[in-house]
Amino acid sequence: MDSIDTKRLNDSNASDRALSGCAVLFLGCSSLEHNFLSLYKDERGKFSVFKVIKLTLSDSVGGLEGYEILKLHDADPYLGVELKFMAMPPCQRFLESYACGSLTQFLSQHASRLLALPDGVEIETQLKAGVHTLDHSLQDIEICLDHIRQSQPVRLRDDEVTQLEQQLQNSYGPPSQPPQELPRNCFLFQKRVFDDRPLTPADQQRFAAHVGRDWKRVGRALQKNCRALKGPAIDNLAYEYEREGLYEQAYQLLGRFIQSEGRSAKLSRLISALEETKMTSMAEIMLGIQPRD
């Protein structure tokens, strides 16, 4: 009997994690002249728009697994992004990020870096699965998941998306070479070598200005090798500086890390934590890497 119950439990867990379905994310701007659709239609801006979308999805879902972009299409005045989900956890994280506004925040950050959107432009989004507008059901994620399950893909990935994916991969550099020994006080990021050094107040300010709601995720990664951030330390920081806002919470987090670790609080450890939490674009900001068009 126990073995039967265990099998049912395992089957149930597998069923809970399995998911196949589609959703369409519509992206728009308050500016009629400078918006995602017009920039995507312009051959000079197409790749940059695609990169903004990929970075936004990676930050929202926490990685690149469990979903794919099938097609980008004209849904005037919006740019429609058709997404296929192949697993429950990434789909659920996507919905939660969309519901709490994190996805829009990520989109705004990446668009301001990579696209020439004028100051003051407001980003508009809408999410649909089949005939259902999921924005009306975000208070109940299970309903949204059911609608996505019912919306099955009717096409394979568009050739243009495949080409853009390949262009994005190529933009990160040539194929990997045989591993070489790194010089002392250096570290590797995206196949490039960077000088390692202790974190500075300028790093602290840059981190706080850009990390937003994800400062806690970075803190959880840093706490694995930092005694001062273990236990309830991160939650205590969140509570203590709640009134001051996200900037101060993030600033104090990295300050606590620097104060505790001294000269061992190095840039490489922060970049490693950002990589672990799939925050590649944030790592690029900390390293001052200019986006590639």
UniProtKB/Swiss-Prot annotation:
SMART domains: DEATH. It is found in: Nucleus; Cytoplasm; Cytoplasm, Cytoskeleton. A motif (Nuclear export signal) lies at residues 156-171. GO terms for molecular function: transmembrane receptor protein tyrosine kinase adaptor activity. Its main location: nucleus. GO terms for biological process: extrinsic apoptotic signaling pathway; positive regulation of apoptotic process; positive regulation of canonical NF-kappaB signal transduction. One of its GO terms (cellular component) is cytoplasm. It comes from the Eukaryota. Keywords: Apoptosis, Cytoplasm, Cytoskeleton, Nucleus. Residues 200-290 form the Death domain. A motif (Nuclear localization signal) lies at residues 216-229. Coiled coil: none annotated. PROSITE patterns: DEATH_DOMAIN. Disulfide bonds: none annotated. The keyword Nucleus applies. Gene3D superfamilies: Death Domain, Fas, TRADD, N-terminal domain. Requires the intact death domain to associate with tnfrsf1a. Heterodimer with tnfrsf1a. Adapter molecule for tnfrsf1a that specifically associates with the cytoplasmic domain of activated tnfrsf1a mediating its interaction with fadd. This is Tumor necrosis factor receptor type 1-associated DEATH domain protein. It comes from Danio rerio (Zebrafish). The gene is tradd.
